[in-house]
Amino acid sequence: MGAQWKVKHKEAAANAKGKIFGKLVKEITIAARNGADTATNAHLRLVVEQAKKASMPRETLERAIKKGSGQLGETVQYHRVTYEGFAPHQVPLIVECVTDNINRTVAEIRVAFRKGQLGASGSVSWDFNHVGMIEASPDSPDADPELAAIEAGAQDFEPGEEGATLFLTEPADLDAVQKALPEQGFTVLSAKLGYQPKNPVSGLSDEQMAEVEAFLEGLDNHDDVQDMFVGLAG
């Protein structure tokens, strides 16, 4: 599992897809604070590309950019907050949230962690590497992920889901690598900053894995949760 946790079951994944636009709107709104021009705002460019791949309506996308950049005259106070702790069976995780009310969110996250353990800042982040994470699919069977990683400037790569490859980069290189991958025969599906576990937990029984999955799914259902990065092997 490792790195970014994703809903595995088809029904749950279908339900989760309904939340994608809401999460992307928050990301776009935050990114647009630094300017509405994707040519000069790398973070905004990455999120806009993700929104387009998710088939976000143009009107929704443009409104989020205008809202974040202040063009609509609205005051948007979204805050990005990160929580660290453990799922059941001492599985470390980092939870990234975007919220307009930090006090409400932290209270609700504490409740969501009742079957795990919410830790202080730094309690588990030392056991993760902060990296750029680019998910890309090969344009042809001949596409070589190792060669693509070298040529594009990625630090490493690993198999992703459904035939895709996860390219790992230095945080500062994320934008440059995702721009270079298409020239190496890969279509970028998503690109973001995230956390890669150094020592993922392994050897859990099926019953223990089910407990961890249920815990993570409960967290993922929270409206303010944007991403979860889990130190779990497999």
From Swiss-Prot:
GO cellular component: cytoplasm
GO molecular function: DNA binding
Chief localisation class: cytoplasm
Annotated family: Belongs to the TACO1 family.
PANTHER family: TRANSLATIONAL ACTIVATOR OF CYTOCHROME C OXIDASE 1
GO BP terms: regulation of DNA-templated transcription
Keyword Coiled coil: no
Superkingdom classification of source: Bacteria
Keywords attached to this entry: Cytoplasm, DNA-binding, Transcription, Transcription regulation
Name this polypeptide is given: Probable transcriptional regulatory protein PFL_3960
Gene3D superfamilies xrefs: 1.10.10.200, 3.30.70.980
Cellular location(s): Cytoplasm
Residue intervals passing through the bilayer: none
